[in-house]
Amino acid sequence: MLKQISASILLLLLLTSLIHAQQREWVKVAPLGAGFSVMMPTRPTEAVESKELFTLHSFVAATGTTLLIAVYFDYAPSMKMNEATELVANRDSFLRGVNARLISSKEIKLDGRSGLEFTGEDERRLYKSRVYVFGNRVHQIASVSLKGDDETGNAERFFASFAFAAITDGQGKP
């Protein structure tokens, strides 16, 4: 009897902590100088990678079996970009990098910035992404989820929360 009560209490504590974890407040991610904000379920893992022609900043968080990704990269000022060409190249490179096939793609705009929304899939995963180009900066947000998982609400919340912000320095000056 004592074992059943202990097991019941343990199960109740586990369920309570899972419910609490799912209901906790999301974190607003607004990196200094990044020019965007987005909500994520946890503090993301941040990485910076510098190459000869660009610098990439990435922010990755997980919720259940879904990964939520926000990246921005700045091309060198010497790079001359065509927005439409860059959007398609980014889409194709993303899908090629994860060995996924394109399912849908459409042009979008947000705050006057040209963008592309696309979805893709491989044998096990679904990919959704939005990419925007403004000058020599590219912003991209993406979700990666397992097929059959019902985590669309988290991905929708993530995508809906993305907003552009003024790019400022450490003192809040443009």
Feature map (PLM): residue ranges:
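Surface-exposed amphipathic alpha-helical segments
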Residues: 32, 42-45, 85-101, 139-174
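Bacterial N-terminal signal peptides that target proteins for export
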Residues: 1-9
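A short acidic-to-branched-hydrophobic micro-motif
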Residues: 58-86, 140-142
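Boundary at the C-terminal end of the N-terminal hydrophobic targeting segment
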Residues: 19-21
